[in-house]
Regions:
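Acidic, contiguous N-terminal accessory segments
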Residues: 11, 18-155
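Feature activates predominantly on carbohydrate-active enzymes
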Residues: 95-277
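Sec-dependent N-terminal signal peptides
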Residues: 4-15
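Hydrophobic alpha-helical segments and their boundary regions
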Residues: 5-6, 61, 236
Length: 277
């Protein structure tokens, strides 16, 4: 009897050892168009090599920075090489109808991010950041092939700084979050009744006067209650250029919003001749 129990127990252990490895499904935002999972994991080196063509220098540098900031992993960049642990690949045959589409291939010993445009590679990089995990000091990825492209060509966020000035660092943080979510249009509301936020050198009073107010209305519109605190600020033309460049490197187009002739009280306070009675 005991020998039979022992045999059954050994059979159970044998069957358990023959089961396929578990698959850890991704939790991604936004969710991709298609994922095909394969049992097993791709394990990258502790200091992986990142290879890329010259046209993807910006994208390679961004990915290197992400690996460092997100996972404390230092990747080595190798330009115009074919073999590496992480490969960025431009190929016009990849989803040719989808300018921002990409394929993330994690089926062998390395990771290949391929697309027909730098914009597609950037989207692949953002997904790659989400699927990566760290185990025993190494980056691992569930084996899979992931295909994705945006459903909407215009994926926008609007920041209203006409009413409340936020500052350049807040804008940079917002652009980073937009890039992570694959959003590609930044509506930048820079003027309104409550403030003028962009330097116009020919009309300096727009920022000397129009960018500042002595107090802000609180509770709700028309409450006639004010906080008594001075508020304001503006962006120089050089700072505007910095933001536009930062956004462009993340496939984000900046659309400045300038209110005229309505919602222009800040401009009229600076130059009364702009108004009518």
């Amino acid at each position: 009897m005991k020998s039979n129990i022992l045999i059954l127990f050994c059979c159970f252990l044998f069957l358990a050892s023959c089961q396929a490895p578990s698959i850890e499904e991704y939790t991604l935002l936004p969710h991709p168009v298609d994922i095909k999972y394969i049992p097993g994991m791709v394990k990258l080196k502790t200091q992986p090599t990142l290879v890329y063509p010259g046209e993807l220098a910006n994208e390679a540098l961004l990915l290197q920075c992400y690996l460092s900031s997100d996972f404390s992993v230092q990747a080595t960049l190798k330009k115009n090489k074919k073999k590496g642990d992480i490969i960025l690949q431009l190929d016009p045959a990849v989803l040719p109808e989808q300018a921002e589409g990409y394929i993330l291939d994690a089926t062998s010993g390395n990771i290949v991010l391929k697309a027909n445009s730098p914009a597609g590679i950037l989207n692949a990089i953002q997904t790659f950041r989400q699927v990566l995990k760290v185990k025993d000091g190494r980056l691992i990825v569930q084996k899979s092939t992931l295909t994705d492209y945006p459903v909407f060509s215009w994926r926008a966020v609007m920041l209203d700084e006409g009413r409340y000035f936020k500052g350049k660092e807040v804008v940079f943080d917002l652009l980073d979050e937009m890039a992570a979510l694959k959003m590609n249009v930044f509506h930048w509301h820079l003027t309104d009744d409550q403030g003028w936020r962009i330097e116009i050198k020919k009309y300096p009073k727009l920022t000397e006067i129009g960018a500042w107010r002595d107090s802000s209305e609180i509770d709700h519109f028309g409450s006639n209650r004010y906080d008594g605190r001075r508020h304001g600020g503006f962006y120089t033309q050089e700072e505007i250029k910095e933001v536009v460049d930062y956004a462009a490197k993340r496939n984000i187009t900046v659309i400045p919003e300038i209110e005229m002739p309505g919602h222009a009280s800040a401009a009229i306070a600076a130059y009364p001749w702009l108004g009518t009675s």
